[in-house]
């Protein structure tokens, strides 16, 4: 989906630094990664968790496994 090609937008609220962990799909990496969101605005390449991001953007048969492997690699 086109939304998965958008770069993550931190969605700043005033001068407050972004501090809410969300997930975005990275076309370059081919999987989802975390980023900090400020709580206002942003774009639609934002997901509550890695699994929902992978399901939406890749339709991978085992999105939880991919997310688990990605988190363990960090």
Region annotations inferred by a language model:
Residues 1-74:
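Cysteine-rich, disulfide-bonded extracellular modules and peptides in secreted proteins
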